[in-house]
Amino acid sequence: MINRVLIRLKIVQIVYAYYQNGGKNLDTAEKELFFSLSKAYDLYNYLLLLMVEVTKQANKRLNAAKNKLVPTKEELFPNTKFVENRFIAQLEVNKQLLEFSNNQKKTWENEADFVKTLCDKILESDIYKEYMASETSSYEEDRELWRKLYKNIIFNNIELDQVLEDQSLYWNDDKEIVDTFVLKAIKRFDEKNGAKQELLPEFKDEEDQDFARRLFRRTILNADYYRHLISENTKNWDLDRVAFMDVVIMQIALAEILSFPNIPVSVSLNEYVEIAKLYSTPKSGGFINGTLDGIVNSLKKENKLTKN
């Protein structure tokens, strides 16, 4: 699940913090990097559990209405299509998700007010109403309902962002990327797999894990060389006056460009320009792009960089 976009973001955060804290312990910082990445995977599982919790909340409401002193006919014989959603039933018994919940002791029980509010939004939505009014019923429709609900109601949800931020500082910048993986997980679900449906693994393969470790270490261990290159290509600037975050981003970008021959230069440049837009000043993207482009051209002229 953890892809290189997320890895780059985390390395920028950890390298910046490493220098702010005096740059003393590389091993400790590396452990912090991988702990931070593991927290992103926890968030992925936690957001999958949220869909189950909302369904449970809807079911509680149906049962409460049935047990009223004088329930209406509709309350006695409600439409149970939503609470009997086959995709959610499969997700609820998923072995990997149950293992996460049991091991991490993570549930939504302490966020009951938020779950109720989210349930209200879902039950009031046109997506829900169209689904409930449909006379057809299939696993595919059940799964598609939750893809739509997640994309339109959970994906950009300010209240949820606040809940997650209060629970873990590691999740501040993760949700937007993790949301895309939750949507992928929903699409991947197949009824015939039952409780054994595989969720996305934490790392796709060892290569991505190695990428994280190597990029982080090269960034720190070769810092003097990378900063020399930056200084040489910003002669009209006092490097001490360049935003420190810009220096960190360029340092990591150079580590990637010079250490990973299979990653095209254009890919690295684009990725770090986008990161600059998130973490630095409004003009940082253009400044970083221009500086790195100048460094790349100089290295190519000196035959110190041969890839495109």
Where are these regions (language model features)?
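Class I Rossmann-like S-adenosyl-L-methionine
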Residues: 1-308
